[in-house]
Amino acid sequence: MDSMTALRGRIAVALVFLVMSVIARPEHAGAGVEYFPIPAVSTSKNDGNDAGLIVPILKTDPDGELKYILAPMLIHNSIVGMRGAINLFRYEPGGREMRLIVSAAEKIERKVVFSYTDPAFSQGRYSLNFSASFFKNATARFFGLGEGTSVSEESNYTAREGRANWRFGVHVNEVTQISVGQRFRQVSLQQGATDLPFTGTQFSTVDGVQGETLIFGNRATFHYDTRNNLVSPTDGMAVTAYAEVNQNIRNGDHPVYSRYEVEVKKLFPSESKRAILIVRADLQATIGDQVPFFEQSSLGGQNNLRGYGVDRFIDKNLIAWSIEERIHLVRTKIAGTTADFEMAPFLDTGQVFNSFNDVAFKDYRMTPGIGFRGIVRPNVVGRVDYGYSREGGAVFAGLDFPY
């Protein structure tokens, strides 16, 4: 799990257990504040084992709509020791959302993450999104480039990163948006927190491993979306395509490279919408020389090939497919707000490759699995997914659906 999704994952676990723990509570409505101390126990293929306490505090408005989640937590991690964090999520009408995460661990790790999104800015004519973060992720992994990397090549590093980006979109009509944006990314690799070999030593000649990398990117995006909700949809289709030109400021020989992606998601609900089949296809391509490894396409993690750890396979290009059946189990009340609980068996497959000439059916990896979700519509989705692969199993927790 990468540094910014790790903390969100603990919140997600808490939300899922929240849904499970209040099924027997009587319903009530109206504005209010409630808190739920919950044991936080989780495991991750890259991040180790966690045990501690998280206290989600939920605030609702007079209509029972969720407005805030404040979630302080204290966790002991098997790799980085004690970790304290404050997580704040604010939800407003029209899909506006603000997230702030601040965290520090006993060993190496530090995180500050802020994001704001408004999908209906200026009375719905535009969309606006910006975010900034600084973090040190001490459990990052690198196995080398390509589809054929071995578990025996696993290495560890601390990713010291600063990121900032903005995106401004124009709604051409009710279902079509065109947006432009820019991003800045600063990355340097430092000694990791595990006993694995240091990436800087084991892969010293791979682009992006040595020294500091500064990336400045410009992106144009086309987005077609007929889904009935951006965060917790039950019907519709979404197509996203982007082209991005980047400059690697520290690279004087080959500073410019480009990235492209086309992603298609389609939901097939049953008549009652108690079961929803979701199909996703994703194609990514990177063009250029000496592209840093962390800027290339990757498989593994909480959003694709969920039976492997984050960034298990990395190369210039990627093809991925996923299918998931979201099955409604129960509906209950949390702090006067309606919450749903569902399970989701899934199958992920895909491959990375250096050239499209290298694509071969035998190189597709497959990871079956099952997920559990707690949903406070329309803004909050907490999930825990387990995927199985030839290298064992992996557990991922996060906010929002994987696709």
Per-segment meaning from a language model:
Residues S133-N137, Y242-N248, Q284-T286, P345-V352:
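Short glycine-rich beta-strand segments
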